[in-house]
Amino acid sequence: PDESFIYAESVDIRVFVQRFMYKRYDSENGTYVKTLMADDLNGDLKDNTGRLNCGKPAGYIQDFQALPDDMKALIKQIKRVRVLLGEVQLLNAVDAEGNEVDVDVHPFIWEVENKDAFKTMGQPFTMMAKQKRLPVQHWITCGSEERKLPTGASFFLPTATVDFTNSIDLTDGDQQKFADYIEWINNYNEYIVNAWNEKRAEKMSAEDAELVEDFIDIEVGGDD
């Protein structure tokens, strides 16, 4: 496959499916803990370590400060993720040497986990819902905005603008693409559920072993 890099200052995305999940980086093992993808974050979500919500307590936390320090530290590591699946086209794309290149529309998946970016990328969907429009009917133009840190360093956040003047007519091909994205999500969720079941079984086996070790051997003597 061609592994060359293509660059663009802005892109148009067409979102077919939006889902939500929790994610946390496990620095000890160098892996990510991820939950199921769901329509929202209102319920508890199984994760691939056999827990819920990447370790975050179930339900609403009434008093965060009352939690143990290790739990507070864990919760701060957990990110809300807005998962966008759809098509992307790069605008005025160039290669590493700055030469203009033509790039076909490509499928994409974007896990938006930065807190500010999570909010920014939610605004187009709120606007479309108010106008009773489907996300797949419009292109969202995404750019970037520089933000300064107190140290003088910079970081960038996405910007998002919806083109409401042009509406995309849905085709049979779009229906198939939508089905493909849903199938991908279902396969991902199946993997998470299987991992959850496996880890839960391991935990139960370990607990059973500890219980057996705690048993007291009782010998019943026979008649003399």
Label for each model-derived stretch:
Residues 86-87, 111-113, 140-143:
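Short His-Asn-centered micro-motif
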Residues 91-131:
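Short helix-loop boundary/capping segments
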